[in-house]
Amino acid sequence: MPNFSGNWKIIRSENFEEMLKALGVNMMMRKIAVAAASKPAVEIKQENDTFYIKTSTTVRTTEINFKIGEEFEEQTVDGRPCKSLVKWESGNKMVCEQRLLKGEGPKTSWSRELTNDGELILTMTADDVVCTRVYVRE
């Protein structure tokens, strides 16, 4: 079983603003979010299939607790409440499908994968727009 535990720092980000645009976030809020999310602090605690993930930026801090295979409530990256279900896709990759609790919007999901060279790859999607953020342990 992969060990996602640790404090992670971002080294690369692609398409974050484009994903926010696909979610309908206005230009002013996108600029603020992109600046704030340029250096997020990510803390992951893992015990077997149970996870705690805290992501802190200068604008907002999010915390989620979940167990693989059990539905839980969280918020989409743009703050809309949703039900999420995380499953193992492979030995080193978990995928999460999100379902909005109310209203309409793009289909959203995320995945986290540990690479053989120790990087953590976070992929977030909004319909067909894919954002990739790469982290290394601090």
Swiss-Prot record:
One of its GO terms (biological process) is embryonic forelimb morphogenesis. Induction: By retinoic acid. Sumoylated in response to retinoic acid binding, sumoylation is critical for dissociation from ER and subsequent nuclear translocation. The keyword Protein biosynthesis does not apply. SUPFAM superfamilies: Lipocalins. There is a cross-link at residue 102 (Glycyl lysine isopeptide (Lys-Gly) (interchain with G-Cter in SUMO)). A motif (Nuclear localization signal) lies at residues 21-31. This is Cellular retinoic acid-binding protein 2. It comes from Mus musculus.
